[in-house]
Amino acid sequence: MASFNNVLTKAAAGRLCKAMGVRMVANPLVVQLAANAGFEALFIDLEHSTLSLADASAIACAGLLSGLTPLVRVPYQCGIGFVQQALDGGAMGIVFPHIHTAADARAAVQTCKFPPLGVRSMWGQQPALGMRVTAIGRIVEVCNAAASSVIVMIEAASSIENIEAIAAVEGVDVLLVGCLDLSTDMGMPGRFETRAFRTALEKVSAACRHSGKTMGLAGIYNNRELHEWAINTLNVRFMLCQQDSNLLAMAAVDCASAVAKIDRARLLN
């Protein structure tokens, strides 16, 4: 099952991996909606939500069975044990928020990988391998290569200053720009059109190209101009396209508004 890490295979083929964020809906049926829509990955958010590790595991395992690569964003400085539980629960990759330095990135890799690449503790049945009892050597080989992706979030001006060193860390797969936090930290919250913000993204792109890493984008959901520029010019190959809560909110507004427009009683009053 670990062979379908869409984050890695899409990037290797020069194609975009589209992720849907899950931060509100705990029911694993949300995975079927994501699959029907055409997403290839799940971004299960334990940083900005009240979802539990048990919720994350259920959603991740549903993703594994549906061909969607499950990623879990863990809370900042959550500790090795929390990351271990997320991986053992079915995550094929961990999203680490607020990575400022190369040392932060190296610590993230160490946490996710089995020895000799890291310090992750061994468990002999992995969801990414179908929960089959598997030879330990095989678990190490498969999980280190394809079922423990390391996604580090670039969310501060200090991260941009250290971007070349962060991108050079062996074992990091994706540098994911958190646009909301980054623009806020730069003193221009939500002003994605500014030259300074665009320059920061260009620096991430250059560092990724130089080190052979994948650039990702998160936090900008309805700006098609920026999406087009990021994908086709900056070579973004992983994108958090939307969150379940945003999709529900927008659909609810659209539905109520559409019905209100044809409500004759309302028009007469």
Swiss-Prot record:
Record site feature (Transition state stabilizer), residues? R73
Q: How is the cofactor bound?
A: Binds 1 divalent metal cation per subunit.
Site described as Increases basicity of active site His, located at D88
Tell me which residues this entry annotates as catalytic: H48 (proton acceptor)
| EC number, as in UniProt | 4.1.3.17
Keywords per UniProt? Cobalt, Iron, Lyase, Magnesium, Manganese, Metal-binding, Zinc
The catalysed reaction is:
4-hydroxy-4-methyl-2-oxoglutarate = 2 pyruvate
Residues annotated as binding a divalent metal cation: E155, D181
Q: Which InterPro entries match?
A: Aldolase/citrate-lyase_domain (IPR005000), HpcH-HpaI_aldolase (IPR050251), Pyrv/PenolPyrv_kinase-like_dom (IPR015813), Pyrv_kinase-like_dom_sf (IPR040442)
A cellular component term from Gene Ontology for this protein is: cytoplasm
- Gene Ontology terms for molecular function: aldehyde-lyase activity; metal ion binding
The UniProt record gives the binding positions of substrate as D181
Q: Which Pfam families match?
A: HpcH_HpaI
Source taxon at top rank: Eukaryota
Report the cofactors. Co(2+); Mn(2+); Zn(2+); Fe(2+)
UniProt key word Glycoprotein = no
Pathway listed for it is: Secondary metabolite biosynthesis
Describe its function: 4-hydroxy-4-methyl-2-oxoglutarate aldolase; part of the gene cluster that mediates the biosynthesis of the tetramic acid Sch210972, a potential anti-HIV fungal natural product that contains a decalin core. The PKS module of cghG together with the enoylreductase cghC catalyze the formation of the polyketide unit which is then conjugated to 4-hydroxyl-4-methyl glutamate (HMG) by the condensation domain of the cghG NRPS module.
The entry describes its oligomerization and partners as: Homohexamer; trimer of dimers.
Give the family from UniProt. Belongs to the HpcH/HpaI aldolase family.
Recorded protein name is 4-hydroxy-4-methyl-2-oxoglutarate aldolase cghB
